[in-house]
Structures are given as structure tokens and as C-alpha cells.
Amino acid sequence: MAKVIKQQYSFPHPPETVWEYLTKPELMELWLMKNDFQPIVGFDFHFKTNPIPSLNFDGICHCRVLEIVPYKKLSYSWKCGPGAGEITLDTVVEWRLYPTDKGTDLFLEHSGFDKEENLNFYIGMTDGWLKNLEKMAKHLNTAPYGTTNA
């Protein structure tokens, strides 16, 4: 049976602000990974981090932008493996943003963990996404939005 990671986080910011942290490479790097993302459907990009040999992961996630609905939805493929073009994890990440009276509710769904060999990825990434969303919240809440007294 395929496993799906689902996370929800609420931010005291409008969807447009949260969207920037999902689509601007320099902001994505603050809470996720180094990347060459561009918000263009069909665009191929990469996330880069340290290799994890125990998971047969070379540290590179090969991705393609699948869908963009500005300020509402973003999805991309997320593929990785041990290197040399071998892919052992083939998944999809989907972000949905909903405006609220207090800001934005952000929903993450990371699907496609359907192979037994992907169980360790699923376990690690379930915790990893939660930690990354907490990092995003930290950066969003300390970013200089609005006006200052200067």
C-alpha cells in the first residue's frame, strides 16, 4: 500500500508571502535545500544536500514542476537514488495554500512511497518535512515584513 506524508502548518502571513518561500530559490534554500527551482510548469530542477549512503541517496533530488496555481497550489515530481542516473524513489510533492482570517494554512502532501524499499525514505522524510516546515516558520516570522519605525 502506498504511503503518503501529510503535514499542515498555519502561518500569520498572507498566501502571497508564504508562496515566496515555496517558489523563490534563495528563500527555499533557507528552510529546505540548495536548488535551481524556477516556477515554470515543465521546468526541471534539483535540490542538493548531503548524500545519505545508508538510504542509497546521492544527495540530489531530480524534480520537475507539474502544476502551478499562483498563491494556491504548487506540485513537482521528486525523484532520487544512489546516483549514476538510477532512480529508486519516484514521488510527488504538492503544496496547497488557503487564506484564513489569521494568515495562511499550508498543506503538504508528499505521495508515491509505494515500494517497500522506500519505507526508510518515508520514515525519514515524514520527520524531515515537519522540521523543514518549522524552519520555514522561523524564517517567515523573523523576516522583515511590513513597515518599521525607522
Regions found by a protein language model. Give the residues of each.
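Conserved catalytic core of Hanks-type protein kinase domains
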Residues: 21-22, 68
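Short hydrophobic/aromatic-rich beta-strand segments that constitute the beta-sheet cores
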Residues: 45-47, 73-77, 106-108
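Generic structural detector for well-ordered beta-strands
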Residues: 8-12, 38, 46, 64, ...
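Terminal, regulation- and interaction-focused segments at domain boundaries
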Residues: 1-15
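Hydrophobic-ligand binding "helix-grip"
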Residues: 36, 55-101, 111
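A conserved amphipathic terminal alpha-helix motif
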Residues: 112-150
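Short beta-edge strand/loop motif at the mouth of beta-sheet-based domains
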Residues: 6, 26-60, 149-150
